[in-house]
Amino acid sequence: MESIDRSFTIRADVGFCSSHEDFMCLHFAAADFPEEALSTPRWKHDVFLSFRGEDTRKGFISHLHHELDYWQAIKTFKDNRDLERGTSISPELLCAIEESQLAIIVLSPNYASSTWCLDELTKVVECMEARDTILPIFYGVDPSQVRNQTGSFAEAFTEHKEKLITKKKVEQWKADLTKVANLCGWDSKNF
């Protein structure tokens, strides 16, 4: 059993299953709620979800969020806004990352085309890398595409360079994607 600082336990039987409706859902089994954990939580959110809305919001993310939130035991932050292109990441979102115990990064074909997602990723790596609390999910992309920035990830970075985003920022995003892609995670082709 793996313990979370909020003093409840997530059992090791975490995994994906296919239901009779043929969708994927993540099952977490939560238990053991000491009273002090409920009164003085260390983290505002147990999980921060980072995802590209156009790829996953109405399908995979909605099911994942539902499963995480089902027992009201795992407090999950999910940004519900559809963002306009070029919008900067909000201070509230940066704060939500800082106040989260764990981040689930859902890397999908268009993830890297969003500067917002990449800025989120940089903040997640900054806050959580040392604690080993980042879980990547490779949704419709091979981990090697993310790690090496090939395919749609290469195309996205070509577009970012054409938009005159600083070389330093682009290199930071690439380094962060590589770090996250090298972590143990889940690949949707194995669900």
Where are each of the predicted segments found?
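Cross-kingdom TIR/SEFIR domain
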Residues: 66-70, 89-190
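Conserved N-terminal substructure of TIR/SEFIR domains
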Residues: 1-102, 127
